[in-house]
């Protein structure tokens, strides 16, 4: 990592930071592709364990705003959205629980990345194993408030949509996806995710419980839905699909 950016220690808890230089927008496309970016830090970790006899889990999230680090957007200012979630967050699991939904079985896997951590990782794995044996299968559910807030009121959002329609009409763009955020209290995120999974069993679902945020959701697409009462199959195509042109 020291070959890609400036490495500095953060504290005494085996943490460090890597500062990458900002991408020079004056570079040609080939040079941009070869320049070091924050993704290279992820590649270093991924490549280090790609030949491991037991595959390790490395996963996380990229935020849409991360594109500003690679594509110059003149005149566009990214404002604080008030959501305490980073643009780039990944996890290398020491203890991993894999679930086979068909057999209803869970498997605990532990990974030790240094000899000094063997005892601690083993203790943590044993603690998790004991908790799994005594887990309560019923999630407690609390009634949520029905008070909903939004980041755009109706008149303001209508004005935004009209402005975007104008850009489509004059040929600036052919597709725009405006967003509007609705917020309400969520006293039990895991129970809410379970209900979402029941109502919308999408193959594109996620639940991330970080120290600073909890993020869960599902894409509206469903791989396949089957209704036993009328023996009907139903699919939802990927959003944004459009017919192939004839020119």
Regions found by a protein language model. Name each.
Residues 1-247:
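Extended alpha-helical targeting/anchoring segments
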């Amino acid at each position: 990592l020291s070959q890609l950016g400036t490495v500095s220690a953060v504290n005494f808890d085996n943490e460090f930071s890597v500062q990458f230089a900002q991408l020079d927008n004056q570079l040609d496309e080939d040079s941009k592709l070869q320049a070091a970016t924050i993704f290279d830090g992820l590649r270093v970790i991924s490549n280090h364990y790609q030949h491991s006899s037991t595959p390790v889990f490395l996963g996380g999230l990229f935020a849409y705003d991360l594109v500003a680090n690679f594509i110059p957007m003149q005149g566009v200012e990214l404002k604080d959205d008030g959501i305490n979630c980073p643009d780039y967050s990944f996890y290398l699991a020491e203890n991993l629980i894999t679930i086979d939904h068909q057999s209803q079985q869970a498997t605990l896997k532990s990974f030790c990345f240094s000899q000094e951590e063997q005892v601690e990782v083993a203790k943590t794995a044993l603690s998790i194993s004991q908790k799994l044996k005594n887990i309560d299968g019923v999630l407690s559910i609390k009634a949520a408030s029905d008070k909903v807030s939004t980041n755009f009121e109706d008149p303001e959002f209508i004005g935004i949509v009209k402005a975007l329609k104008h850009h489509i009409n004059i040929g600036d763009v052919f597709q725009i996806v405006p967003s509007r955020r609705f917020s309400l209290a969520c006293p039990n995120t895991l129970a809410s995710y379970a209900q979402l999974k029941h109502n919308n069993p999408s193959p594109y679902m996620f639940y991330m419980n970080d120290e600073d945020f909890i993020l869960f959701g599902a894409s509206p697409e469903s791989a396949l839905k089957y209704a036993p009462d009328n023996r009907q199959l139903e699919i939802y195509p990927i959003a944004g699909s459009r017919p192939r042109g004839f020119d």
